[in-house]
Amino acid sequence: MSTREGSLWGGRFADGPSDALAALSKSTHFDWVLAPYDIVASRAHTVILYRAGLLSEEQRDGLLAGLDSLAEDVADGSFTPLVTDEDVHAALERGLIDRVGPDLGGRLRAGRSRNDQVATLFRMWLRDAVRRVAAGALDVVGALVAQAAAHPEAIMPGKTHLQSAQPVLLAHHLLAHAHPLLRDVDRIVDFDKRAAVSPYGSGALAGSSLGLDPDAIAAELGFASAADNSIDATASRDFAAEAAFVFAMIGVDLSRLAEDVILWSSTEFGYVKLHDAWSTGSSIMPQKKNPDIAELARGKSGRLIGNLAGLLATLKAQPLAYNRDLQEDKEPVFDAVAQLELVLPAMAGLVGSLTFDVQRMAALAPAGYTLATDIAEWLVRQGVPFRSAHEAAGAAVRAAEQRAVGLDELTDDELAAISPALTPQVREVLTIEGSVSSRDARGGTAPARVAEQIDTVAATAARLRERLGGPA
């Protein structure tokens, strides 16, 4: 049987918890990351207790000095949890009491419960963590923009269903991976509006009767406001689920980018060469250069999706207010952040180090009769109904297939036999350069439009980075 040492409860219990219960309840192996935030919140709580007349000036100063000492020891690693500490809160209270004594140290817990305490600390930690994740995502965007700017006119095969479809600019394709990541970061910016609400002062569920000021401590801790409902504040974790969704979405977006790198670096595609520093070899096949970063990023996305699904499953069907199930809310989110902090810099480095074989991409761009749509649209511009234009373009593809030639290799007579409207002027669009240049509407793959996209994406990334408090 365990003792109650290291617990914040026990007066009505004759015996300590069973060893099995103590082992199950223990959370210091993952919630210790909240320790710096716990101490910051305890400093603010000390000041609020003093303002409420629950501490003398001497007691306030003694607690603050003890908390400062504890913070230094936590930071340098000289104070860590003991095996008997149930959680981060119990460990830090023990550390504070060691420094200021049980009478003074025992006063800090007045007016707060672990329920409102951990809900607040989780929000504090997560508001910082999402900024780190966002910065990493913007670094990947920066790498994509740099590659796009370095290849402003390179043309490649655009694909749908993984089949050659229409020529597009490489820069256009790269920016198509940047835009989803920008939306992910924008979600993080928006997320903070809901995360910046402080549960502190809600107590276990009903609020405090000690005259504390939730708004004051919210402001002290950098929150925009205090919670309007103490039950909701202590029991809700939708903020964590929202963050977990964004993390999973980033993982999915990275996975799609990773899949392109994996395909493009294969012998069959041959679009890119991997840098030695950002690839691995084989233990048995000397010739191999493997896209492990991309494959690991693709694999991590499943883990991030699993973290989201697990968290949502934990939250469902819990009655109000707080339930101990919520001990399980942090590990999925902590893990998601840890995985992204590994994957994002690796993906930024991988993308930035890619060497593109622009000649091969250009040579493959017209393969598979990707200029057929250009024929149809050229005919429409000549006044031919699209249904007829589509039929004529399809007939041109069939004729080229029968001769095993490209569309541009059909003779003027062959084109005229397909449709009298197919005059020699159609050859203006039977080049990949003419094809991409013709797609000049907003969002299109024409060089002028893609150049605008590069500037827009770079400016958006800089604006988001500034809003998140980082360097542009």
UniProtKB/Swiss-Prot annotation:
Catalyzed reaction equations: 2-(N(omega)-L-arginino)succinate = fumarate + L-arginine
GO terms of molecular function: argininosuccinate lyase activity
PROSITE patterns: FUMARATE_LYASES (PS00163)
Record-level GO cellular component terms: cytosol
InterPro entries named in the record: Arg_succ_lyase_C, Argininosuccinate_lyase, Fumarase/histidase_N, Fumarate_lyase_CS, Fumarate_lyase_fam, Fumarate_lyase_N, L-Aspartase-like
Keywords attached to this entry: Amino-acid biosynthesis, Arginine biosynthesis, Cytoplasm, Lyase
Documented EC number(s): 4.3.2.1
The protein's annotated pathway: Amino-acid biosynthesis; L-arginine biosynthesis; L-arginine from L-ornithine and carbamoyl phosphate: step 3/3
GO biological process, alphabetically ordered: arginine biosynthetic process via ornithine; L-arginine biosynthetic process
Protein origin, superkingdom: Bacteria
CDD domains: Argininosuccinate_lyase
Protein's cellular compartments: Cytoplasm
Family: Belongs to the lyase 1 family. Argininosuccinate lyase subfamily.
NCBIfam families: argH (TIGR00838)
PANTHER family: ARGININOSUCCINATE LYASE
Protein name: Argininosuccinate lyase
